[in-house]
Amino acid sequence: MKRLILITIVCLCPLLVAAQRLLRGKIMEKETSTPICGACIAVKGTKQKTLSDKAGDYQLTVPTVGAYTIEVSAVGYKRLREVVAAGGDVTRDYYLEPSSTSLREVVVRSSAQSAEINQIRQSPMAVTVVDGAKLRGRSSSIEEILTRTSGIKVRKAGGLGSASRISVHGLEGKRVAVYIDGFPLNSPDGSFDINDIPIDVIKYIEVYKGIVPAEYGGDGLGGAINIVTREDECDLVGFTQELASFGTVKTLVSGQKLFSRPGILFNVAFFKNKSKNDYMMSWPVFETNLPASAYRKVRRRNDYYEANFYHVGLGFRKLYFDKFDLECAFYQNKKGIQSLNFDARHAYTKGINIMPNLVLEKQDFLVKGLDMKYTIVTPIIRSNMTDTATTRRQWDGTVTQAVGETDDNLFNESHDRQFEVRSKFNLKYTRGRHTLNLNDQYAYSAYTPKDERMKGYLGFDPSAYPSRMTANNIGLSHLFVSANHRFQNALTLSIYYLNSRIYRTSDALAKGQVTDELAPKQTRVERSYYGFSEGFSYELWKDVRAKLSFSHNVRIPDTGELFGNGVSIKPSVNLQPEVGNNLNLGFIVDRRGLCGLVRVQWETNFYYMMMKNMIRLFPADTRSIYTNLGKTRTIGMDTDVKVDVTRNVYLYFNLTLQDIRDRQRWFNDEQGTSNPTYNKHVPNIPAFYYNYGMEYHAEGLIGRRELSRVYIDVSHVGEFDWGWQMSSLAEERRKWRIPSNDIFTIGLQQSLWHNNMSLSLELENVFNKENYMEFKMPLPGRTLKAKLRFNLFRDKLAGGAMSL
């Protein structure tokens, strides 16, 4: 710990003692005063230069004596020069004139966004950025886009609305934090599906594969996904309708009105997603010892999904705060519980989530150069599981007597309640080439299970024993960027606090009698933990950059792991946080004109991670419970190549290899028993997968200024074992092996009506292959999708219905 304090002091001292002259201000468009992101401002004849951020702000070190010439330039704008006399710190705002109307409408906004993405890619973190502009109007879902990204694999258990796990460098599930605009997405009851987020509202997606930025709270074990949404502050009307196989329908309606004079922004949005998910599957599933004649095709009839989302927002832009937003969202869903062993028809889950929230942002808060962001949201959740069926319909049509359709063979009719308060407070202070960032992320959760039928099994009313959790994460980071942006260094320190009070309301289900002694006991856990990370980024040669980072991360158990679900999962009273040590080495090449190609981008990462206290779900009596495992070790690499062959042809290929093994040699029992799975591959995680594809896009093929795109994507996942391979017999190994698969997807897009409308067609799983990503969880076959998108923006800079 002393070494950490010493390192912190050494890194922060230059900030305190630096004596330099600074030129600072904003770079804006002359006509509209819109901030220009990615504009270059430089001292002519020197290496001193910098880029403006997304708010148009810049800071530049300038000579202390004499006069110097400032040059300001940005793609699509006329170059500006000014002679400035040296002296003290100077504040200057620069206004650039568009070089032409077409550039202003087509090039400028995209180039500014590209500059912002490049700044993220050059940071010391191991990060991949997916440009949302290229996804606009496509029929693909967010999960489908992510699973084609290097180092990432999304594991789905079914169609729309089914459970899924996002894997980043072998870390998956809740170890990968998911954010929207830097705020945790993970819904408290786990009901929110990432695919419910419309792909057209995405600005870009950041995928962090090691260090997680301090402003996101760092609540991930070395992996995080941040979905950055578009903020088009102008009048707009949008409508999207998508139809797909298996009864899938997605509808999105949105509208926004900007009152310029008072600076008031009002917006509303609604989406509805539903699907029957009634695709065919082979039955019995994964019974490899049966003859071919024993298999038959059956239709899933209880895998339906429906979700509705309503949003209303009111924003103020001319108050003391630069951004003052009041928003409220209402989300509800319903999902059938599909069984693979019989033809389920009745069991289902449903949930309601009301989420009022407040967002405050202020630049130059209290002092010059200090930016403040504050967000608070109070989710109010109601979740239900209903399973009261007294019969079961078998796949052959016969009906048998039963107690429910779920695996626990108990009637369930839960009405659970959950209330949360989540807040995030962030301060960022920039002075010269140094940036300090202080982030505080707080979460409080109260969970009250209620089930009248479960009350009879337990012998007491579980709603009389609510559980509580309080968690807080404080992170402090320092970022240094050299004058020419060639070197960057990021140091982060984090403190985690957990306070949980949990009642063991499910313990009585393991008993055979009901007495007063079965009333649950409360267990309280209160602990603090620390984490840190250090990252370096250095430009070795022009367009070639190396990255090195190390992090010690902690993931605090979430409410679902601590509280259980009141039905099939017991509370985990002594659950410990997961701890991981990560080492990443990466290289980036981004060069134009290489070997006659328009642009070549290449990224590769080598990673090593040692993790302990891995949280896994295991059987416990008639229920399940989350428990901590020992140690696991991960070694791997991923590489990603993107090539713009010509202005119209684009190719990509990415590959991931990883080796994940159990490194717990001995069990922590009194006898010191040896672990039979020591040094064996951790099951149920793909070790080898790759993606490749090509795209042809052009402007003016069908109508002047209309855009066209044709593409093909291919995803391959190598075979992997679902369980520990303890046998050397080929027949036994085959029973637990998930086969490899190759999924081909083809699609086309066409814009219409001056790019205010787009039509998209996509065919997924072209060859209708039987596909598994989870054991005994077949995925849909060939799927046809059609999407119509209409978007009308008052501000043409906001873009059209699709983009190249």
Predicted regions and their residues:
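Short, acidic, small-residue-rich periplasmic hinge/interaction motif at the N-terminus
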Residues: 28-32, 40-44, 73-77, 87-136, ...
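Short acidic/polar hinge/loop motifs at secondary-structure boundaries
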Residues: 58-61, 183-210
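Extracytoplasmic beta-strand/coil segments of soluble accessory domains associated
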Residues: 127, 138, 143-184, 203
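Periplasmic-side early beta-strands and strand-to-turn transitions of outer-membrane beta-barrels
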Residues: 242, 260-347
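Membrane-embedded beta-barrel scaffold of Gram-negative outer-membrane proteins
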Residues: 262, 547-551, 578-635, 656, ...
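Face-selective signature of the C-terminal outer-membrane beta-barrel domain
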Residues: 313-332, 351-515, 521-523, 527-541, ...
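Gram-negative outer-membrane beta-barrel transporters
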Residues: 601, 605-610, 627-721, 798, ...
